[in-house]
Amino acid sequence: MYSRSLSALAFTADFPPAAPKFHQRTHRVRLRNLGTTDKKSSHKIKYKKIPRVHQNLKGGFYMKITFIGATHEVTGSCYYLEAAGHKFLVDCGMEQGPDYYENAEIPVALGEIEFVLLTHAHIDHSGNLPAIYAKGFRGPVYATDATSHLCDIMLRDSAHIQMFEAEWRNRKGRRQGKPEFVPAYTMEDAMGVIRNFVGCPYNKMITPAEGISARFIDAGHLLGSASIELTIREEDTEKKIVFSGDIGNTCQPLIKDPEYLHHADYIVMESTYGDRSHGEKPDYVKLLSEIIQETFDRGGNLVIPSFAVGRTQEMLYFIRQIKADGLVYGHDGFKVYVDSPLANEATTIFSEHQYDCFDEEAMELIKKGINPISFPGLKISVTSDDSKSINYDEEPKVIISASGMCDAGRIKHHLKHNLWNEKNTILFVGYQAVGTLGRALIEGAADVKLFGEPVHVAAHICQMPGISGHADVNGLLDWAKAFEEKPQKVFVTHGDDTCLLYTSPS
């Protein structure tokens, strides 16, 4: 039914190659990205023009979709819909990164939005929920149970970051006579919207409003992630629109593979890796065990900068198997420190949702009484004193800490204590964005600055290839080809221009 190219899908969706003209490129990092000009902020906010999709069919059926974010970029997913006499959002994500297209303003008073349907907990899909709460939204947020629980910790963490950055900017700004910088939202806003979450099981139809029903289908991207099948009824007409969310990579550790859907009139589909194949997956357990062995034999530490939610739990899964199979010789009982408050809370939530989210391999371990993400020698650091004490442990050890790109969090302290020593290894297990400390290290920086001080890079720097929570071009097209009848339109989003329009050589 489909050719093997995302450009074909984009064309089917009438998503024109010239679409970048709708946008204004900006190079400013901005916390506040809802509303118009912020009089209290030190700069003005520009918004991109956005395409609106209207479907006015016989029988009185009318639906409008406004693409607020994740158009010609990956972050800031947000879709505003008017249908069956209701106004609502699918996702409400925050823009991330220093070089992006800014989200447009939601074209309605936020108090008029009745509800939000949320695909998953990642901040680029959920991170602006507290911001719309601060501006008047009081409706329910429907998400899977696991997503609701992850958002509880992730939105609170995001609010802490917003407030910390605003305080830091204002300390500098006051000395320069600049006006106060206002954070995107506060902890009170985050807690307010968290209280409005409604947890939903997979595959159960819900009715958030008259004439609108929705179903969450496992997307296999993150614990609790979902594609959303939305059914809209007006008079005698019924239309089905599917939002893919972020489609997961197959054969990920711990969580299930993405489920396919088979019927839709319209599809809104992501394209994060729409221009590339991940290639053959390496044996991660073998590769990681070899890195641990080589590092420990030198008498060094293995430091793993890791995303707190998802990637940290995958690393624990691999290390449990390494320990169980005795793949590291001469270092029995080696310690593994997880030093990230957010990662620790997320790991607890993973364990609480094993029965509805874990895959067959993980469930087989659980049936045998084995926790797939816990093992002897695992040490959880909670307090700052716990974190500091790791540096006094002279035994070779594994340290897993956030943030995954090394720009914030406790990982910076561990890099300061370990980068200078040639016995140690720094292992990157996730994407490193341009401009981050992690990117500088993998590109061979000889010296870096940490806490204002220069640190020489003598440690071994390496990467574990191929780890991704996103489907590649083949996985995306397999997901699209599962639809048994050709939809009326497919809208390709959540990717840069290359990914949107690229024709895969495979």
Segments from the language model and where they lie:
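Short, Lys/Arg-enriched N-terminal segments with co-localized hydrophobic residues
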Residues: 44-62
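Conserved beta-strand hairpin/beta-sheet module of binuclear metal-dependent hydrolase folds
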Residues: 63-109, 114, 151, 227-244, ...
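Catalytic core of the metallo-beta-lactamase
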Residues: 64, 83, 200-259
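Active-site metal-binding motif and surrounding structural segment of the metallo-beta-lactamase
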Residues: 99-150, 156, 263, 267
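Active-site neighborhood of phospho(di)ester-bond hydrolases with catalytic His/Asp-centered motifs
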Residues: 113-122, 129, 142-144, 218, ...
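Metallo-beta-lactamase
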Residues: 158-222, 354-394
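Hard-cation-handling environments
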Residues: 291-300, 306-429
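Conserved small/polar residues in nucleotide/adenosyl-binding loops
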Residues: 502-506
